[in-house]
């Protein structure tokens, strides 16, 4: 059975993602024509997708079922990524150094975690606006993913970066984010994209849990867009932060 048909069991809110992933991906790698190849530049084998790129239905299934390990690059994209990793090695740069210096133009000292520990189980309090994700425009930067997965030409992959660390759900065994954090991200994307004419049918997003993160010290989410005009995305990136969350947004989602 086509795994993508399972997508009908998931809603657009992406709040019903399971906490863990399947133990074995062999059947998915076979179905999606993915092979594993080891490189001395990578700690784990690289996943190479042969044949056609992931379709939009494939992307929806992978993200909404939270089986993010399935994503892979084409061979050409993998070669390009390995060349980049070699360049980092030759220049004695970490991926974090590169992102801060060449892409985000942030100082490492600007990265921070929430400063106030709340007595309750709540992760956020409007009493401490500096600890609210996607609230302070200066905390946010939107960039194209320089090394996207193997998607169709009408699909764009952007990353939304945050100086403020997006908290991990303390009850998650795999380092996933909480339902409240997912609601906040949904609201931010609704204001940034949907309110400007982009349908939810054109948007999916995910945040890698800890075991999948190649960049751990700089929090970010991945947003995948289908059939969205280049000009819209370029203007969004040049604008910097998107439509940030207000204190009222936080109140309404509590």
Swiss-Prot record:
Domain of life: Eukaryota
Induction annotation: Expression is induced by N-acetylglucosamine (GlcNAc).
Main localization (coarse): cytoplasm
Keyword vocabulary terms for this entry: Cytoplasm
Keyword Cytoplasm: yes
Pfam family, any one: DUF3605
Gene disruption: observed consequences: Leads to increased resistance to the chitin synthase inhibitor nikkomycin Z.
GO biological process: N-acetylglucosamine metabolic process
Coiled coil location: none
Localization of this protein: Cytoplasm
Record's GO cellular component terms: cytoplasm
Iron recorded as keyword: no
Chain's role: N-acetylglucosamine-induced protein which plays a role in the N-acetylglucosamine metabolic pathway.
Protein name stated in the entry: N-acetylglucosamine-induced protein 1
Organism field: Candida albicans (strain SC5314 / ATCC MYA-2876) (Yeast)
């Amino acid at each position: 059975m086509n795994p993508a048909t399972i997508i009908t069991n998931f809603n657009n809110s992406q709040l019903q993602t399971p906490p863990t992933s399947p133990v074995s991906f062999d059947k998915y790698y076979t179905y999606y024509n993915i092979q594993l190849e080891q490189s001395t530049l990578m700690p784990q084998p690289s996943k190479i997708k042969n044949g056609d790129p992931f379709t939009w239905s494939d992307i929806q299934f992978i993200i909404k079922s939270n089986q993010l390990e399935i994503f892979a690059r084409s061979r050409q994209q993998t070669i390009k990524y390995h060349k980049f990793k070699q360049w980092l090695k030759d220049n004695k740069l970490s991926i974090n150094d590169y992102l801060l210096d060449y892409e985000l133009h942030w100082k490492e000292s600007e990265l921070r975690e929430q400063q106030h520990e709340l007595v309750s189980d709540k992760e956020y309090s409007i009493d401490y606006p500096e600890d609210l994700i996607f609230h302070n425009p200066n905390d946010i930067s939107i960039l194209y993913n320089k090394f996207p997965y193997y998607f169709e030409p009408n699909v764009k992959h952007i990353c939304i970066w945050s100086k403020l660390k997006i908290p991990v759900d303390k009850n998650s065994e795999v380092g996933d984010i909480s339902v409240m954090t997912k609601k906040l991200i949904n609201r931010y994307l609704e204001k940034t994209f949907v309110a400007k004419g982009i349908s939810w049918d054109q948007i999916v997003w995910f945040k890698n849990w800890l075991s999948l993160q190649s960049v751990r010290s700089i929090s970010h989410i991945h947003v995948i867009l289908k059939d969205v005009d280049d000009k819209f995305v370029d203007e969004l990136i040049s604008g910097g932060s998107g439509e940030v969350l207000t204190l009222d947004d936080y109140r309404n989602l509590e």
